Amino acid sequence: MRSYLKQIVAYCLVSLCPLSLLGQEQSKAVQLPKDWHRSWQEGAQGTRSDEALCFLLRKGKKPRPIRIGVIDTGADTTLLEIRPALYLSPRELPNGQDDDRDGYVDNRYGWNFLGSPNGEIELTSVGTTAFREYKRLLPYYKGMKEAPQGKEEEFAYFRRVAKMAGIERYERLQAVTTSKVKAFHLLDSVLRQLPNVHRDSLTLGQLVQLDLSGKEIEAAGELIAPEIIKADSTTAWHQLVQQEEQKLEQINHRLASIERDPDKRTLLGDDMHRLSSRSYGNGRVSGVGQEHGTFVSSVLVGGGTIDPTVKGVYTPAKLLTLRAVPDRGDEYDKDVAAAIVYAVDHGAKVINMSLGKDLSPSEYLVEEALRYAQKHDVLVVQSSGNNGRDLDQQPIYPTGLTSSGKPFPNFLYVGASTATGARASFSNYGKHVHLYAPGEKIWGTMPGGQITAEDGTSIAAPVVAGIAAMIRAFFPRLTAPEVVELLFKTARQGEVPIVDALAACQAALQKK
């Protein structure tokens, strides 16, 4: 406990210095300081999380260790900025055995729900949920214009996901590209027959000077004219023909692969429709696409080893790294649900989920997992998404609502705010977006140690999760719903309610 307190005191000593300089930097109308989201003043309306931490220490409060589950793309476990904060399972050795008998082999830092146990399969690009659902239903409804009797609802769903996935648009692109390729071939056959025209060295600039006539040729020329205009005049004719042929080949391949190629997620070995079936995945939490999860982790617990002003919101917390979000495409409901259960079972009191999607065919699994988190008093923080839309009209999943539409009391939906206290233009909003937090020009660390600034509700969520972890560490008797209510009631009111860590901690001190 003494070393834990020592770490927090050191954090405060470093953090107070930038606070004293904040007014100087802003008065000169220079760019925002890198730690603005952890402080506050006019023009830099952050969360006062640094001040809150120092306030608690001055009041003689002693925190308990706390773990945060980070459900994301994984993280760079070698990165010095976050490595000291990664929870290391004390009884698990990298020996291919389940040493601590928790059902997971070699889960030293957390768990990877995107890979097979032997590591031969690793899901990196999985497509949107709408595309995957279209792919699943295509064998049953291919070519149908009307619903089979008794299948009206599912057929309507099939048509809906086809539209969401852009299948009809892609099929139209296939038809247009096919016509263009035919036009290219027609014109190419004419050029081959012309005397004194060297087709293999002919440039587009030379092509447009040729006197070609005939209805079919003119129609073909009109069809491919846009491609010729877009290309450089020095481009060889035969190269443009090849490019269009390759484009069509790629389109045909992609459409054919919808039926031909299996959904690799089905090869991981679990029952995707049962949450109890969790014996899949592996312990490799680093991998392709880990940049997002690494940055989110640094916003939570970054140590400031590269730049002392670029630190996490609550550095003493320990992270459970849960790789459940692919590099490209939508996360699977089953993986998110399984990751929530893992985090709960392994001691997390706060879970950060900087993820979201437009469709959730197995929403019941996530609801089951959120009920499990609620039962074990775990607070879940979810980013609201970056579509700039009203979630009351078009939701993002998970919604944080039960199947009956009732909000989970242990769930926080977080939008992004700007330094001026406004809602960020990209941030989703709605009556169930409880809080906002800085999500614009937030500094953190990427794999390899690169310091950079990012925007997004994905960044606002860990700001809130870090504050929630701080409160739960210093006030362990407060339940998850009580912390949610506390953060909501003490939020700074303005255009949008912005989380205020100092006000929340002051209120918590009076409460218990």
Residue ranges and their predicted role:
Residues 54-68, 73-331, 408-410, 428-432, ...:
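Subtilisin-like serine protease catalytic core
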Residues 53-63, 288-290, 311-314, 330-352, ...:
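Mature extracellular/periplasmic domains of secretome proteins
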Residues 1-26:
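Bacterial Sec-dependent N-terminal signal peptides
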Residues 344-355, 362-364, 376, 409-413, ...:
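C-terminal subdomain of the subtilisin-like protease fold in secreted/lumenal serine endopeptidases
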Residues 323, 352-356, 383-384, 415, ...:
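A cross-family glycoside hydrolase active-site/sugar-binding cleft signature
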Residues 27-38, 145-167, 171-174, 181, ...:
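Short acidic, glycine-rich surface-loop motifs adjacent to enzyme active sites
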Residues 72, 385, 456:
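Active-site glycine-centered loops adjacent to acidic/histidine catalytic or metal-binding residues
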Residues 378, 399-473, 477, 481:
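Extracellular S/T/G-rich loop segment that most often corresponds to the catalytic His/Ser-adjacent loop
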